[in-house]
């Protein structure tokens, strides 16, 4: 094993299986240098490439954590990420880029599945109760949403399960059951039931307040997102008279951030729930 691979394994025990953080063998400054060279080589013939803007704290920034649930051949219930280019689950207890509270909640759910004698989804057989757990956290508000993606709408011992989960993690803001009973690689299904709380969380980004639902996309790195949006607006050299289209607008984070600087901005999106959230977010921010 090379020194670089040994270093990556020391930092993250599943780095060689997961494939998610492919530059883990480098220090963060080395990663930025590597990316700068790659982008520079690709684009330098067209335009000057400015230095990459890095993060002060490049760990545990990811405010959305998604874990697949399954069993090993020996029958052990596990949760984690899919191995690169496969649907094999790599058992993960914690991750260097994921929100710490989210990882702790997922570990608790793994234990509760065992203690409540619930089943986990068998992808080959197409049956089982728990398929995925999705956790979202508002970076500014600290509100936390837990989405239990299940293969059936029936939830044995539901009330007791939720009660114990909230006792272990009283800071959870809302819990939603999403039912996905189809043979599909898609994580979320169509039907949802709010089990606790209001069914969504809120967060503040670029001075705007946003409602975030289970199916709605929200940038996973809010610290860098604010920098990214700010630079995009700065480089656009807006005069305040422009009409702008925000394609794939999601819940309207770019749309509403841009609205302060232009005459009119149109958000376009295919996901219905995202548009519902976007309209609500426009009202919340008096747009």
What name fits each language-model region?
Residues 2-5, 157-287:
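Rossmann-like S-adenosyl-L-methionine
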């Amino acid at each position: 094993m090379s020194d670089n691979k040994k270093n990556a394994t020391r930092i993250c025990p599943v780095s060689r299986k997961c494939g998610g953080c492919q530059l883990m063998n480098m220090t963060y400054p080395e990663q930025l240098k590597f990316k700068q060279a790659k982008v520079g080589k690709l684009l330098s013939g067209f335009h000057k490439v400015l230095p990459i803007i890095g993060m002060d704290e490049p760990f545990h920034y990811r405010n959305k954590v998604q874990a697949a649930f399954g069993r090993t051949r020996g029958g052990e219930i596990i949760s984690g990420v899919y191995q690169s280019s496969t649907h094999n689950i790599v058992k993960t207890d914690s991750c260097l880029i994921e929100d710490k509270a989210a990882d702790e909640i997922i570990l608790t759910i793994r234990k509760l599945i065992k203690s409540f004698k619930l089943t986990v989804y068998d992808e080959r057989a197409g049956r089982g109760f728990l398929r995925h757990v999705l956790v979202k956290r508002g970076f500014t508000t600290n509100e936390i949403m837990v989405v239990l993606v299940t293969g059936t709408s029936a939830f044995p011992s539901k009330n007791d399960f939720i009660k114990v989960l909230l006792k272990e993690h009283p800071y959870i803001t809302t819990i939603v059951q999403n039912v996905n009973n189809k043979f599909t690689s898609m994580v979320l299904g169509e039907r949802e039931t709010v089990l606790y709380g209001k069914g969504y969380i809120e967060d503040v980004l670029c001075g705007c307040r946003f409602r975030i639902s289970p199916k709605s996309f929200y940038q996973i790195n809010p610290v860098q997102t604010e920098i990214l949006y700010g630079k995009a607006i700065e480089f656009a050299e807006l005069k305040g008279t422009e009409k702008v289209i925000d394609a794939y607008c999601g819940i309207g984070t770019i749309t509403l951030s841009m609205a302060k600087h232009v005459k009119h901005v149109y958000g376009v999106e295919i996901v219905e729930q995202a548009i519902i959230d976007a309209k609500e977010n426009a009202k919340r921010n008096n747009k």
